[in-house]
Amino acid sequence: MRTDQGTWRAPTVVLACGAATVPAVPTLARLVPAGISSVTPAGYRNPGELPLGGVLVIGASASGIQLADELHRSGRPVTLAVGEHVRMPRTYRGRDILWWLDASGLLDQRYDEVDDLARARNVPSMQLVGSPGRTVDLNVLSSAGVRLVGRLAGIQDGVAQFSGSLPNVCALADLKLGRLLNTIDAWAGAAGERFAPTIMRTAPLGLDLRSGEIGTIVWATGYRPDLSWLDIPVLDRRGRAVHDGGVTACPGLYLIGMPFLRRRKSSLIDGAAADAAELTRHLAGHLDALVGHRGRSAS
């Protein structure tokens, strides 16, 4: 490994740089008309730093709804483009929802127990805010005055084009939330509360970005890892490391802290310990094999 402090050599390397290294901005962002500011959550600080005018927030996962909420509270007109999302209450049955997910064992589900691992590793972040007991979802935002539109499908001649599938996307998120709460209730042994379905109002399918209505676009479209510096053939065509539970095809090269590495909670702070213990055993076995091989070679 070449660094600004010299070259390091090691028989094993663990990549713990995570999956949220750089913002994942879609290529159609280059079609945004001149004069409109584009910013990602990584570069956003507060509403006062944005140019005057309305704000179009692209993406309705954790960052998207939090920023839409803050911007609207500051007095900005906000339009929120909603794609696939994971609706989630902050609290359920008197406890934080993460307590239920952990206690019921849902976060302990292993990577070899799911039918579609690739999809499970790319599930959007839950629609949660950090304020205790405060839920912010599409109903809350819409009732407050945030305009909801469908997923951004394209930009043509300065007009943002939105998908017409918003009702179906929201209905699916509501359905999945209901299934999750049913699972928690089955573990708890009693039925709990249920939440009103997402209320849909008529959503425009287009927005003229040249009209002056929008001054800023916030690309809350997630993050991606950046392993471009890794000169080892373990990356797929998208630049993501191919691995089996953190073990790559390159002997001695491991990953940790990635989404659903070995468990649903792998990318959470309290989820790394179990993964680390299992990977350490594999790593130790690799080192033992190296020592044994060197010993046999020397003799």
What are these regions (language model features)?
Residues 1-299:
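Flavin (primarily FAD) cofactor-binding/catalytic cores of flavoenzymes
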